[in-house]
Amino acid sequence: DVHFTARVADVAACYCEKVRINPGNYVDPGRVFKHLEYTDAEYADELKKIEAKLVPFLNICKEHHTAVRIGVNHGSLSDRIMSRYGDTPAGIVESCMEFLRICKRENFNDVVISIKASNTVVMVTTVRLLVETMDHEDMHYPLHLGVTEAGEGEDGRIKSAVGIGALLTEGIGDTIRVSLSEEPECEIPVARQLVDNIEACAILREKAEASIADDTITITLDDEDWQTMQLKVAMATGALLIDRKAHQLVINNPHFSAERLVGLADAILQAARIKFTKTEYISCPGCGRTLYNLQDTIARIKAATSHLVGLKIGIMGCIVNGPGEMADADYGYVGAGRGKISLYRQKECVAKNIPEAEAVERLLQLIDDDRKKQ
């Protein structure tokens, strides 16, 4: 999984079966939210720079029979793309298509695509637009689906099911990953349940759509397992809510209390970004770049902030997607190196390289100070 240094991808392609590159930082520098002005000729020159680095990489991949994942993240779009297309689904798609067009010209077809965002509405809208754009340009590459930085616990599972399920029930997607801020093995059972319930949830989605009245989806199930039921409801209603065909959700199931079902409905509405009834957390699954105890930190921040309804907090392992995925968050906690943390207020880094032992308290103090000023 290569970021920032294209040469690393060249070396990895000699030894690995598949290499992921990120169009947002493969050639372009990491985003700093700076607006850039280009003439059409200057912009074309930027595309030539991509081709100059990508074609040799593709040739190495051909030689070693290495596959490539072009993995676009909403959080790491380049300033070049953002300046020309805005922070939009169209910009995310174009970031991918610039690379796909080169692959097609070079007759390199061992390509998988992923378009990920922590915002389910952005993720679903963008993947649909990508499919439409690829069809228009006669491209047919497999799609990997995921809601990035989905979080952990029930909320992370529900957010993943809303986004991934919306597309799976439309017949879009070839592979999936449920990204949870938990031990990696916790992701597989959830992903398996999503895949195993595609057909059932597609039928349930039709019934849910037929039920819409007074801006409300009413869905009835008889599942006795709580997680199975919550994933099925999220999958079946995700697209309907993301498309704003309804703004309210009623869930009926004789095996669970009304209070618990209302809580599930609220969680699904929040995952679809319709109604916010609790603090919103964006947190990544962690990887080799995460140099602090992510799970413990999330638990501590949640324990101290869960009463702040509507507040959005990003808790990120590193800078690759951190500042970008948190661009619409109120506050951010981002790994900055071994034992070091940087804190953000919206897009602004307000404290750099804080010792990890102090960082959670510093974040809470920042939030408290800002709230006192309001």
Predicted regions and their residues:
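Catalytic alpha/beta core domains of metabolic enzymes, predominantly
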Residues: E37-I50, L54, M82-L308, K312-I315
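Glycine-rich phosphate-binding active-site loops on the catalytic face of alpha/beta enzymes
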Residues: C16-F33, E170-E185, K245-A258, G335-C349
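Beta-strand/loop-dominated core regions that host nucleotide or nucleotide-derived cofactor-binding catalytic loops
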Residues: R338-I341, C349-K372
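Active-site beta->alpha loop and helix N-cap motifs at the rims of alpha/beta catalytic domains
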Residues: V2-E98, D223
